[in-house]
Amino acid sequence: MKKLTKLLSLTLLFALAGCHSVLDAPTEITQPSVTIPHNDAKWQQHLAQLTQINAYSAKGQFGYISPEERFSSHFDWQYKTPTNFGLTMSSNLSSKSLKLQRNVYGMTISDSEGRSRTEADVAMLMEEIIGVSFPIDQFAYWVKGQPEQQSNYVVNEKRQLAQFDYAVNGTLWKVRFVEYHEDRQPNLPKLIVLENGSQTLKIRIDHWAY
């Protein structure tokens, strides 16, 4: 499995040509001048619209930063159900790609060279891939700007999810929504930054479909 998980870095290390890299995207958000309560009617209306988006796809760029390395990739996220979604990462400078596919048996990781592995323990596989626990099942909702109902999150004056923290297996992820696509209803995230103290994930979503 070392060769397969190592391929993630080898696949993504290729710089993205012809476009502005997500690695240079800002990480800070403008702190809300007014914090909107969770029972606010407009926020609840927005939340209801997000909840109705069941199957969707998101395409854009993914960036990873740690003390040891930096890399970026194109990504294609296809979500159908909680046990049927996939993430494909690729470079426009190489034919190499890597795919994560969630199914009822767990998760399968495969590469463009034909290697694959399936694990029932999704959390363990994600930790092997990026080195720390990452809640990819919850991420399926976060990427829409939809928080968990009982979580401690912040809503900005535009009735958008602004930020929240999420602890998983001793790792605290700080999630910030830096920018939204405001030319569509409901507003959907354009730039999301996740940090855990030593690692930063930047996700820029260029295209939404649902």
Swiss-Prot record:
Lipid-modified residues, N-palmitoyl cysteine kind: C19
Organism: Glaesserella parasuis serovar 5 (strain SH0165) (Haemophilus parasuis)
Membrane topology: Lipid-anchor
Entry keyword set: Cell outer membrane, Chaperone, Lipoprotein, Membrane, Palmitate, Protein transport, Signal, Transport
Signal peptide range in chain numbering: 1-18
Major location (coarse): membrane
Lineage of origin: Bacteria, Pseudomonadati, Pseudomonadota, Gammaproteobacteria, Pasteurellales
Protein's name in the database: Outer-membrane lipoprotein LolB
GO BP annotations listed: lipoprotein localization to outer membrane; protein transport
